[in-house]
């Protein structure tokens, strides 16, 4: 499998490898199968017992997740940036409203409910 641009960030490289795998019929038939594979990889991560095994399984989870994004026709880089911004905005909301008596989890849920994500 030849991926020409070795300067791409790992997220983009993985996405490109997944697309190439599809052309070689080394891919799942549909989104549901790709999602099942992701869940399987998450379970393997959960069951791993050593740090090295956990790291290896985490890489597999990332790779499978990027494959799921391909089935959704979602650019993983863009979707990750959106999620990061959502987290930052919600964290700012929590930071702005926190006091000694306030439960952070309650504020977080409030931020989610009020769509504090853009």
Feature annotation, model-predicted:
Residues 1-3:
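Short, small-residue-biased leader/transition segments that mark boundaries at the very start
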Residues 5-18, 36:
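AMP-binding/adenylate-forming domain of the ANL superfamily
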Residues 18-21, 65-69, 111:
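Generic structural signal for hydrophobic core residues of well-folded globular domains
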Residues 34-87, 91:
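An amphipathic alpha-helical micro-motif enriched in hydrophobic residues
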Residues 69, 75-118:
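Basic, alpha-helical terminal appendages of large translation-related enzymes
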Residues 20-33:
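Active-site flanking loop/helix segments enriched in acidic
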